[in-house]
Structure formats: structure tokens, C-alpha cells
Amino acid sequence: MTLDVGPEDELPDWAAAKEFYQKYDPKDIIGRGVSSVVRRCVHRATGDEFAVKIMEVSAERLSLEQLEEVRDATRREMHILRQVAGHPHIITLIDSYESSSFMFLVFDLMRKGELFDYLTEKVALSEKETRSIMRSLLEAVNFLHVNNIVHRDLKPENILLDDNMQIRLSDFGFSCHLEPGEKLRELCGTPGYLAPEILKCSMDETHPGYGKEVDLWACGVILFTLLAGSPPFWHRRQILMLRMIMEGQYQFSSPEWDDRSNTVKDLIAKLLQVDPNARLTAEQALQHPFFERCKGSQPWNLTPRQRFRVAVWTILAAGRVALSSHRLRPLTKNALLRDPYALRPVRRLIDNCAFRLYGHWVKKGEQQNRAALFQHQPPRPFPIIATDLEGDSSAITEDEVTLVRS
């Protein structure tokens, strides 16, 4: 999808990016970040298409301290991407270039875009589709953890889809190496996907810190969001949302969960454990019964005659199932008036109509609002939450500080 071009999206001049221009021909804009633009580009020699992330690191926009910070973070991201290169579910760094004013990172072109956009279009995914996506994501996370890398910013926006709807994990800007037994204290990530221990660590100087378990919490939030179409933790006041996260307060109360299996609810519950020591690891999550259906079974050793008979019976059974699925049970007026939302076809009709009328702003209950999933606010630097809470901010009262800490 091509995006509108603004003055800040102008291409670097030839002198500032000579090496990049000699090899690639930049095309239309396909995405934007906080301090970067992503363009489709074409390899001049082969004609192959890629995506290039262009970051301006000039003194005109950033202070010297910020410049060094951005360059160091980008180099760290490049180092990690090269270390994990070759995994089928992690984005591949093809090329990189650096000049005095710009940095260029060339990646595989993921034509289907972000999982977030796909979810926006579909509203909620089936268990079958979710199973495939989450299995691939957990395999990527397990690979990172085996290599002592923690991602720290897992969310649908950082999961890309290729032409075959296979996922690739991207955006390793917050990733870092973490040796066994080592702990982190830095507050980073996206609020709705932050693990409780990250928040507690920022509010309590005596907290021991957090580890790789934060990635599994984020996987639990993503799994819940894919199936429900809305996040597990949301409140219009962010301070209360953070308390919900720290206490692990979420519910399977929206109508979507009526059609979900207890198996997937069990997996979500084991990923969204407030105690990181009780939370599943990526390897353990992949062994959960929810993923049993993904495992390939041994092929039957059948004769040609037996294969033909199986094919005939399969076709006949499929025809009978298709025929019976079109025979809807009669809907009485009393049933429709009594509880229309309890009837799955009617519920889907209501949801589709509401979604077409109001877009993403569809209320899902007193404590759930689909708006939380689709809000786009400019990211701000993360201060220490304790400082925010104990300051004189007019947006947060002393009562709310007590509420969060109680």
C-alpha cells in the first residue's frame, strides 16, 4: 500500500547516499516509523524488489547525544539481525549502508504488510489461523531465547506477512542480548504489551529486574487479541490499564469467547501469568495441546484401490456436509427478540453492520473497547513510571498513585 508523501519524506540526495543509489532504485513509500521511512526499492542489477528503511541521523533534527543513541541502537539491531539470519520466521537483513546523515537497512519485501492491518480487516481470526500464526511466532521467539536474545517489543505491528501468509518477526530496535541469570531494568516497549514485572521494576528500585519471560507475556496478549479482536488489558485511563496489567485482570467475557475452545483459553492463562516464574517458556508453549493439530501425522500406507475408495468416500462426505451446512435451523421471532446476540449468525450480522458503520470504534463492553487496538498515538520517550506517578502531573492524582501501588 502506497502512502502519501510529505516534505519530510523526500529522498536523500545522491551525495548523501551514493553507495545505496548505485545498487538500489528507491520507489514508493510503504510505511513510516517514528524517525524513519520505509520504501519499496528495486535492485538495479537483478530487478528484485526489497524494502528499505531510511533513517535520517543529521544534526539538524537530533542533538549529538540523540544521534549517538540512534546510531548505537541501529548498529545493535543490525548485529542481532545478522546473528539470527536464516530463520524462516524472522525478517532477513539483506544490506545496510551508513553515511554522515542517513542510515539504510534493506530487508525482504513483505507484500501482505503487518499482521495488525490484516487483523483490522478481519476483526478477529479463527482458531485454525491463529494456531498457525502463533506457532510460527513462538518458534521465532524460542530461537531468539536459545541465542540469549530478548525482543521486548512483540506486537501485531511488528509481525509481517509474506505472499503465502507466513509471518516474519521484525523491528528489533529494543532487542538486546541477555545472558542466563542476567536481568534488565530499562522500561521500553508498547504499554498494552508490557509485562507486569517491567512495570513493577520501574516503580520499585528494589525489584530484581526482568528477563526473557516478558516476550511470552506479549505472546499471550497477541494470542488473546487475535481471537477476540480486542486486547485483554484496556481502560480509557492508562493508569488503570497499567494496574490491570500488574494484577493480571482480564476476562473471557465478550461474545467471541463463546465459540473458542477451553484449550486455547488455557494456553492464554498460562502465558498471562503475573509471576514470570510460573509463565510458560516458548518451548513449553509449543508443546501445549493447542498446537497438537499442527503436527503432521504419518501418511497411510494404502494400495491404489484403497486410496480410490478413500477419495470417493471423502468426496461424498464433503458433499453431505456442504449440503447440511446450508440447511439453517428455523429462527423464531421469540428467540430473536429474547436474546439476538446469543445467535451466532445474527451476532455476526450485527457486528458486521456496526463495524461498517463505525469503523474501528466498536464498543465491546464496559471494560473492553476495540478502539484500544486501533489507536495510533505518537510514541513518547518512556520516563520512569514512578517519577510520572509521584510528580505533579495534572493528569494523575495522588489517589490514583495510591490505587496503582495498593
UniProtKB/Swiss-Prot annotation:
One of its GO terms (biological process) is signal transduction. Its EC number is 2.7.11.19. The active site is at 153 (proton acceptor). Disulfide bonds: none annotated. Catalytic subunit of the phosphorylase b kinase (PHK), which mediates the neural and hormonal regulation of glycogen breakdown (glycogenolysis) by phosphorylating and thereby activating glycogen phosphorylase. May regulate glycogeneolysis in the testis. In vitro, phosphorylates PYGM. Belongs to the protein kinase superfamily. CAMK Ser/Thr protein kinase family. This is Phosphorylase b kinase gamma catalytic chain, liver/testis isoform. It comes from Rattus norvegicus.
